[in-house]
Amino acid sequence: MEGWQRAFVLHARPWSETSLIIDLFSEESGRVRVVAKGARRKRSNLKGALQPFTPLLVRWSGRGDVKNLTSAEAVSLALPLSGITLYSGLYVNELVARVLEPETRFSELFFDYLHCIQALAGASGSPEPALRRFELALLGHLGYGVDFLHCAGTGDEVDDAMTYRYREEKGFIASLVIDNTSFTGRQLKALATREFPDVDTLRAAKRFTRMALKPYLGGKPLKSRELFRQFVPKKRPLPPEGETA
């Protein structure tokens, strides 16, 4: 690779006694796996920079599936995530690492990711709106095109008070049946604008994104969810799956 790229660390794991294998999300090359030689040494200049949620400038070399990281510099301090927002950020990182094909450019998604992490870092309330917006953006970049504003059966604009059932590869069709695939016109309009003014629209957004992301994630559970279970006190109720890690 020639030149520098903006990037974030999605995941890192030890490799040999002194090095790391790192999944990066870069602006121009998408998800890239690199080996950071010597990054685990106490005096390594890379050790402090290669942390999740730290904006980086990176360079690498090589043509195989795993590149050699040659340079990495922190552009700024890590975005401050803690508690529920930290687990939300880990969920976002795992989602990107799981669903993106390696070395495929997703420049617009890179900025959607950045905006999501910034929103989580600045969140004073629930992280859910930021998570739902990112999930919808991710689905759009994956080619999951859905018309939320028109009935797939008639072409008419959705009505706030009517119910529509989702049909894969078709869209939303007016229906009297209410089940887990049903949404009101009001909820669909919220999905289209990615604005969720209340609990009802947030829950509908979570329900839709869980359903839409399932084929990309397969049956393998998200590790970030298990981390949440492990570190959050048991007396505190767990958020529904997909809200955070």
UniProtKB/Swiss-Prot annotation:
The keyword DNA repair applies. SUPFAM superfamilies: ArfGap/RecO-like zinc finger (SSF57863), Nucleic acid-binding proteins (SSF50249). InterPro entries: ARFGAP/RecO, DNA_rep/recomb_RecO_N, NA-bd_OB-fold, RecO, RecO_C. Belongs to the RecO family. GO terms for cellular component: bacterial nucleoid. Disulfide bonds: none annotated. This is DNA repair protein RecO. One of its GO terms (biological process) is double-strand break repair. It comes from Cronobacter sakazakii (strain ATCC BAA-894) (Enterobacter sakazakii). Keywords: DNA damage, DNA recombination, DNA repair. The keyword DNA repair applies. Gene3D superfamilies: Nucleic acid-binding proteins, Recombination protein O, C-terminal domain.
